[in-house]
Amino acid sequence: MAAVTLHLRAETKPLEARAALTPTTVKKLIAKGFKIYVEDSPQSTFNINEYRQAGAIIVPAGSWKTAPRDRIIIGLKEMPETDTFPLVHEHIQFAHCYKDQAGWQNVLMRFIKGHGTLYDLEFLENDQGRRVAAFGFYAGFAGAALGVRDWAFKQTHSDDEDLPAVSPYPNEKALVKDVTKDYKEALATGARKPTVLIIGALGRCGSGAIDLLHKVGIPDANILKWDIKETSRGGPFDEIPQADIFINCIYLSKPIAPFTNMEKLNNPNRRLRTVVDVSADTTNPHNPIPIYTVATVFNKPTVLVPTTAGPKLSVISIDHLPSLLPREASEFFSHDLLPSLELLPQRKTAPVWVRAKKLFDRHCARVKRSSRL
């Protein structure tokens, strides 16, 4: 059986410090006979020497573009939209192009033109249809952290100020310490403890959000944990404007009625101050929180909702929340992905990879039909 060569490309998305392969997983894959190249990345949370010590061959950032075709290129986030050259390799990454997101056809056209292949990390599933690896827990954890910080900021600052820029933390403990400090300062102003409504509370993301809320001192009685049972009646829901913080953790797989809308939010009695849209399906035509239109970033974490009644309301819609805790999130994800990566030598027959390839082929066929290729 031919040995597999993986090439870890340097992430190019601003402030993306996570990695699809960690030094830990690199060492384990090399022990299984893999050959691994790692690009030197100035923004990675991992020092390049950690990869070198794990046995990887270090190469310059961007060198994947001219690498031999037999290398499988692995990364996390999408490539720059300004890149249009054909993609000739097999790629493992999150491409965000299977749910009709803005520009999805352009992404797939690059693979079609280069005869490359995409194995989308979002759609690598086990035999039960569950994702083999996801950042959901740390997305929920980080989203809840910023949600509490924004709510607390509003208690201690005037409405003409917005939550300032945030940057990645070295570890979970440091993040929890900062959020707890902000939370206690808010309570010291006389603010009552917030009520937090989480939709999708039973999944990975929801459990991460709940874990953070507990760790910073929000009582469990103040956390409304909604899932399919509570949302089955269909939105919009009157309970959302009456919570102080609303965290959306659902994975959008089909069109649903919106959870809330401007009519519900333009209420002088609204308590809601902060919405955290962890799913951040900003460009999805079926976004269940149609009250904002931009994805926010760490440099500017919130966007104002243009309400006409009630207190100031902001949305946090960062689509790479786990990057707030890049080291722990990467280790967590890479550990779960490892068993599937170990099957790459059998990717023509291993169900997890066969399913991913079929899905890629199906969406490429859609592009070809629409462009009459």
From Swiss-Prot:
Disulfide bonds join C205-C249. The modification N-acetylalanine is found at A2. One of its GO terms (biological process) is lysine biosynthetic process. CDD domains: SDH. NAD(+) binds at R130, G203, R204, D227, T231, Y251, V278, I318, D319, H320, L321. One of its GO terms (cellular component) is cytoplasm. Induction: Induced by alpha-aminoadipate semialdehyde in a LYS14-dependent manner. Repressed by lysine. It is an enzyme of class 1 (oxidoreductase). The active site is at K77 (proton acceptor), H96 (proton donor). Present with 111934 molecules/cell in log phase SD medium. This is Saccharopine dehydrogenase [NAD(+), L-lysine-forming]. The gene is LYS1.
